[in-house]
Amino acid sequence: GQMYRISTICIAFMLCTFNSAYSQELTIHPGQLWLDNNGKHINAHGGNIINADGHGDWDGETRSEDGGPMPGVSAYKSDDLVNWTNCGLVLEVLDQPGHTLERGCVIERPKVVYNKKTGKYVMIFHHELKDKGYDAAMAGFAISDTPEGPFRYIRSLRPHAGVWPADWTEVDINAAKALKMEDYKEWWTPEWTEAVKKGLLLNRDFDGGQMSRDMTVYIDDDGKAYHIFSSEDNLTLHIAELTDDFLDYTGKYVRMAPAGHNEAPAVMKRNGKYWMITSGCTGWAPNEARMFWADSILGPWTQAPTPFKGDKVDTSFDSQSTYILELPNGQFIFMADRWQPWQLALSPHIWLPM
């Protein structure tokens, strides 16, 4: 979709940090260039920040400044969440023809999480293969001893080949199995939408595994990790339980908001309730964010009004959610990207207090 340049909304806010030794007041100016220790805009998009030994570690997509193939994922490190040091590429694409990580592939929305059981850092990302557009729709996995990498690439796959959702009955499964793509050639009709809700696309991809595009990873209080991703041609979110090492799926997953067309999920938990912010699907162009809540990460989820207030609600302040950062003082920061398709490397970061 087309994106229009519009004037930046200046929202400056104070930040409490992971490290109590830093008590000076710090201000963030969303939407402006955010310079690292080398004086360059932080080139880590669609990523997340974790608290690693009292400092912030920010991993995200590194886009090429000249519009060429992306080089991979970079990490940045900070003691105050405002001044960031570039640690360089932590997962690099490869100059190996035929390799799934071959230069020209696309890595989007990388999320790095710490696994307390194994002591390893795990990166999960949306992976598209070289010269295949957005057809691959795979989930990629990599592992490291430190959040600053280097990450060792493990594999990419489509989740849940041969597995139906955990909450489906025999009746649900048989209804989905009866749905054939050739009976629904025209998209967006009421009949088609109803068929998607019942599992038309889930059944189509059943043998080879489900599509995995925009995504996040959420670790619950009990240490269980969940991979939450746009599936079924971006029409339905899947919430999938990961194995104890975070490197595979247990096979337990549920669908959320079938045929709802949600992307860019970001999750938080407050006072025992789970909250998810998503965006609609309009390519690189921004749209109004949506919010859902649940008493359990596996649902059921209920849609709530948009969380945004103010002038730019219909485009979520011209941004798309990437992560919700919880600070030690219980404050939450909504992290988002204001995508600039003409120069993705310089896409501004939008941080808003929640």
Kindly give the residue locations of the regions a language model identified.
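Bacterial Sec-dependent N-terminal signal peptides
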Residues: G1-Q24
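Carbohydrate-active catalytic/glycan-binding domains of CAZyme proteins
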Residues: Y22-M354
